[in-house]
Amino acid sequence: MKKLLLIFFLFPIFGFGQDDCGTIPTQQQIDYLNQTRNARKNWNQSKSPLLIPIQNHVVRETDSTGGLTIVDISFVMNTLNTYYINSNIQFYECDSINYINNSNYYDFDGNDESVFCAQNDIQNVVNIYYFNSVISSSGAGVCGYAYFPPGPDRVIMNSSCALNGSTIVHEIGHYLSLYHTHGPTNTGTTTELVN
């Protein structure tokens, strides 16, 4: 019985091997967000929806197996539009899905991002990359991460997390300059964001 209880209490330690979000703003991004806060506050909600083009990049094994399907990408796009339409923001696919068949990147290491994305990014759109798994440049397994303005127009996603109905919305929120509710750090320490 004691062994069973020990296993029961140790299970949660091993059950959380992946952090949800790998997005941590740089000081430059924090300064930019602070400087542009008033412009964002004054954005007129009565305007036509803000249309944001998306280029979806699905990374698969070299033999074309794995990766998200067209139906999966449709789910992601519908999820984004459902969550953001009340903020007068609408997303659309600017081109067909870019399938990247390369087993070297199927399980993604954030240290390879600059080289890999330089070959695939499309300018002036949000590039969303879907990998089998994502390890951030700090070595943590994450569901995804994005860049605050004025960073790269890019979101990196673990494919399974992209389909959970919330992580892609969360990461696009960072792209749109939203902090975590606990402030600009990715720790449990809270920074007060309300005056």
Task: Give a label for each model feature.
Residues 3-17:
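Sec-dependent N-terminal signal peptides
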Residues 18-126, 130-134:
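Propeptide-to-catalytic entry region of secreted or membrane-anchored zinc metalloproteases
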Residues 74-77, 154, 169:
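Extracytoplasmic/secreted envelope proteins and their assembly/folding machinery
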Residues 118, 132-151:
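Catalytic zinc-binding patch centered on the HExxH motif and its immediate surroundings
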Residues 151-161:
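Glycine-rich adenosyl-nucleotide cofactor-binding module
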Residues 161-195:
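The catalytic-center signature of Zn2+-dependent metalloproteases
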